[in-house]
Amino acid sequence: MLGTKRLTEQQLTDLLRRLQRVEFGKWGETDITTAIGALGWELQHGEVDVGMWRAETGYETGAAIIDRVPPQQNLASRAQFYAIELMVLRSAVRGEAGENHRTIVFREVLRIMLREFGQPDVRGGDGGPWVRWRDPVLTVELHLRRFHGGVSLRLLATEPLEQMEANAIRRGDVSGWTAYSQRPELPLEPAVSDMGEFTARLSGVLIDLAGDVPVVDTAGTVVLRTSDWSARYVLAAVDGGLRVEASAAVKGSHREGLGYLSGLGYQQPSGKMPNWSRRFGDGSRDSASAAAHMMVDALRAFGIDDLYDIVYDAFTADGERMYLPVLGIASADSMT
């Protein structure tokens, strides 16, 4: 496509196989210099910007950018660098055509990486889906920059990366979604207490999931429920479309809330759907916002007005547990 540059399949395959033989050590200056040489790239001496090195790759997508660990991070790790980013696809095409082309290329590259690396350890999305293969020293990430840029391949220092991401979560500086095949110990984001802010955050998560999960061939479900499993719950299922459900099994005085669900936009249970529900035709911003409001309104109808009374369960169709600190409420996993 005019206005795009990309690695060939052979170039990408050769690079991925070389990566499996390269040692990054402790991610110090000597380690990075040696690793860049082993990749067949030429390191440009001197910083191209504050905290950045540059390596000429010989690819038409351009140089690789090597990022130092920011001094303000104050990490326990002694690594001096934490990320090397290379564009697999560099795209200047705007609009829907550009977005569709970047998505197609991302899926093609993902297929090659699955062949070479096997199943990923972590998947997620923030401005486009990303996939990670992790070992204790090196994490390899493929990221679709959906709205601009193209498709990037990032080589990440595992320990510094995870410390920096944990610090960001504790500050509340986080967005998007993450799904783990094996969930590690993870920090909680500062709690959200305002229902309006929570609804906006939930809407953002649903927008991200609706755009991302079809690209990585899965589906996602987010459940909001009381921590005592009182049968008061709502859920959103993202599977190429968007569906919300509200429990039909609430008990006692809370059953009075069922009388409000029709007015909130829910359809009554049927043979195929035992819960109150509504399906949206797409996962657009408007649909996600409406879905989030319907979920929160149903919780209120069930007598839940305090976010401290609910937790979230979230998972993909492939069995991965999703981690959504952006919601600002506890996960069900953290309560066990």
Residue ranges and their predicted role:
Residues 1-267, 271, 299, 304-336:
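Short helix/turn-capping signatures at newly exposed starts of structured segments
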Residues 98, 102, 284-291:
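Residue-level preference for long, well-ordered alpha-helices that form the structural scaffold
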Residues 267-289:
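Short, intrinsically disordered low-complexity segments
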Residues 294-295:
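Alpha/propeptide regions of enzymes that mature by internal proteolysis
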